[in-house]
Amino acid sequence: MSEIEQFYPRLVVEGADAALAFYAKVFGGEVTERYANDGRVQHAMVVAGPARFAVKDAGDGDPAPSGGGIPVIMALYVADPDAVAQRMLDGGARVLFPVTDHEYGERAGRLADPWGHQWMVAKRLP
């Protein structure tokens, strides 16, 4: 039996408050926790449906991703990936791969948020 009780990604960004507002808006979620010290967010939790992830400001030992990207892609399965992608674009994200139907039975695309984190938005096709 696994000893894991919980798992979620923690995104490191420059400008956590702006990132939190972006994520809550584009994913239809809410910020359920926010702890700051000296004006820098140390930990904040975004909850959107069954998904949850943390956000924090970059700092000593926790650098934000560079413009070259990061080796992690967050995968979100949603009812309408086109609508989520559009909200992300409206908030300043950029398209890496447009939302389209794929031969493996998904409608999916990938975007980079304004802080460099990559998000795949998808739904399984019938």
State the predicted function of each range.
Residues M1-R10, L20-P114, V121-P126:
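Vicinal oxygen chelate
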Residues V13-G15:
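Conserved beta-strand-loop-alpha-helix junction that forms the acyl-donor binding cleft
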